[in-house]
Design a protein with these regions (language model features):
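Sec-dependent bacterial lipoprotein signal peptides
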Residues: 1-5
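Extracytoplasmic copper-binding redox domains, predominantly the cupredoxin/blue-copper superfamily
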Residues: 7-246
Length: 246
């Protein structure tokens, strides 16, 4: 098992669901007998910044969904310093390999007048399924620069929106044009090797071919960090990241 730890102070969308299909015999096949994994955790040190209260008064249904009180989620740190909603992915080391997109859709829900999840990943060509669980109308607007930008209103009980991203792009900010406090971020990658840190700061990337990789982490307020790690045959490695507060 390898172990690496680091720290730092800072650091085409909307295409039809059947586009970008590629012959299966061109895809790289991972050998399960030699594949490894990466696990780790993201932590925040220093003074924990206070979370700002969000004013949802423009929509009473949103206020009611939070019992009258809602707080900013751009930096979620628990009492032990665990940092949630950090996007973790393999940035370098997979060049020359083409991976088949998962046939399992990635779901983003508009629930409680938030996007859930706030941070997510999807492969190029993988279905993004957008649903609205709220009793109010929302508008999902991914502000892509490499992929095609789009926005679409979705009322209560409307059918899911089905979209795909065609090109890699990290990260694409998403907003709701109706509710100004609603934000999310999606990382689009040409491979399945990404994760999002949980509430306890942990993450895991599985089924990774042996090799040397650059692992990158992204947090919407704290920026990016990069670390290099080598995965041996059928081995696991641990890599931790620390963001330092002021």
């Amino acid at each position: 098992m390898a172990f690496i730890s680091g720290c730092s102070k800072k650091a085409e969308m909307g295409s039809p669901a059947n586009s970008g299909i590629q012959s299966s015999n061109t895809f790289f096949q991972v050998d399960a007998t030699t594949a490894g994994s990466i696990t780790g955790a993201i932590r925040f040190t220093g003074k924990k910044p206070p979370r700002k209260r969000i004013d949802m008064s423009e929509d009473p249904a949103c206020v009611a969904a939070h019992g009258g009180v809602a707080y900013d989620e751009s930096l979620v740190v628990d009492a032990k310093g665990a940092l949630a909603n950090v996007f973790v992915y393999v940035e370098k080391g997979l060049e020359g390999k083409t991976f088949e997109a998962s046939d399992v859709p990635v779901v983003i829900d508009q629930r409680g007048c938030w996007f859930r999840p706030r941070v997510l990943g999807v492969q190029t060509g993988q279905v993004l399924r957008v649903i609205n669980s709220d009793p109010v109308t929302h508008n999902i607007h991914p502000m892509a620069e490499v992929n095609r930008e789009w926005n679409h209103s979705q009322g209560p009980g409307d059918d899911p929106l089905i979209r795909k991203f065609i090109k890699p792009e990290v990260m694409i900010p998403i907003k709701c044009n109706i509710h100004s406090w609603m934000h999310a971020f999606v990382g689009v990658l040409p491979h399945p090797y990404f994760s999002v840190s949980k509430e306890d700061g942990s993450f895991e990337i599985r089924n990774l071919p042996p090799g040397t990789y650059t692992i990158t982490v992204w947090q919407e307020r704290l920026g990016v960090q990069h670390r290099e790690i080598t995965i041996a045959r059928h081995a696991s490695a641990v890599i931790n990241f620390i963001y330092e507060g002021k």
